[in-house]
Amino acid sequence: MPEMTRRRLLTAAGAAAAATFAAEFLPANVRKALAAGPPRGSGSLQDVKHVVILMQENRSFDHYFGTLPGVRGFSDPTAITLSTGKSVFFQPDTQNPDGYLLPFHLDTLTTSAQSIPSTSHAYTVQHSAWNNGKMDNWLPAHLAADGKNGPFTMGYHNRDDIPFQFALAESFTILDNYHCSVLGPTWPNRLYHLSANIDPAGTSGGPIIANVDPVAYTWKTYPEALTDAGVSWQVYQEVDNFGCNLLEPFASFQNAPVKSALFQSGMRTFSPGQFEFDAAHDRLPTVSWLVPTSYQSEHPDYTPAAGADFVASKINAIAANPDVWAKTVFILNYDENDGLFDHVTPPTPPAGTPNEFIKSGTEIGRASCRERVLMSV
């Protein structure tokens, strides 16, 4: 047995203390479920009967979790060096006397920083910030696009600002190398989320690299594939879905009769609390997609706190029923980074890779700035 050194003892004690602290910010049913230990079962995917997927809006990994211990955040030893000779965190800024701007804390305890303005996440601006992988143009890109709000690109929150999000990350599983699908805005990323496609060849209504739907899309979606396979599914949304149900632009859903299974599963709206009721009473389908309301989406300038309330309500309902908790996987991710800085260079396809470029040669397949994702319950 390895010797229990003082350092290892302190590390273990610190981890235990952090877990205890984090649990205080989780809803009551989740705390109870965690205290009960892992559910009995085979420990394999055979135990999973329900998958619940929630895609929130517009936050980058560093913006939320740059200060989280144990992940590739601000202490990342592999952070790249810019052509200036400085770390990627020293973003060039010609308007700053120092010549650079470092990530800075958005203190929500003494300011209104829960409600920061949204910065541009248009395809062209995102690619300008990325600068062909040099990762050195965040300030010029956002000062040009956002004016006086441009520096918000470098702002971040810490544990005191977003305690619930930190509690999830420390109690479950967080992936620090997850990237969204397109270096651009909501629509292309949510289309990949629901269909793995934005029609790069332009044969079925695409290619989609902006938040527009000039024609109805005709390619096949994941929900339709589930229907063909005999797998039950449901989109849970309210009347206010913030335009985040990207089944709506598809011809198959637009033309579906109101009483049809396709419309009822993909387009109908529910009163607040319907998912919570179905989860607590073990009435969930095999796959559920949750769609946030506008103010609970976490899209700036909506608040992380309102998003925390939305997420907490969902996982608390799952944990209310031990049988449901034991057989449910909950996946939380974010569609894109808004215009918020992240230091990790996204993976990109080689030039000429099939289905990664639209007809004009504009690249569409590059992953966006790194997003936090996957809190698995």
Residue positions per predicted region:
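N-terminal pro-sequences and low-complexity stem/linker regions of secreted or lumenal proteins
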Residues: P2-R372
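Hydrophobic alpha-helical segments, chiefly the membrane-spanning helices
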Residues: V373-V377
